[in-house]
Amino acid sequence: DVVFGLHVTNAAHGLIAYREGASMAAADPWKITIKGRQAHGSRPWDSIDPIMVAFQMGNNFQTIISRKLDLRESPAVISVGSIHGGVRSNIIPAVVEMEGT
């Protein structure tokens, strides 16, 4: 027997909820560093824009879930929790970091 205290659940407060079979999943953290080429915002053709790559990756992660996995067999979620890159509004950065689970 085992008991878990959950911080994210739909169960009513003050009650004990249970179910038979699997009911939780693991969180597997990941971190990606995207390396591009910095350029001034007025000359985007001189850059390899890691921000655009990060946008596309975030969108495409959802395709993995909806098109590559049979969710009846293996429920899954991919979440992007943070995206960090750049320090100036008019400079395309050289590096962007993404993290999630």
Name every feature range the model reports, one short phrase each.
Residues 1-94:
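Histidine/acidic-residue-rich, glycine-tolerant segments that coordinate divalent metal ions
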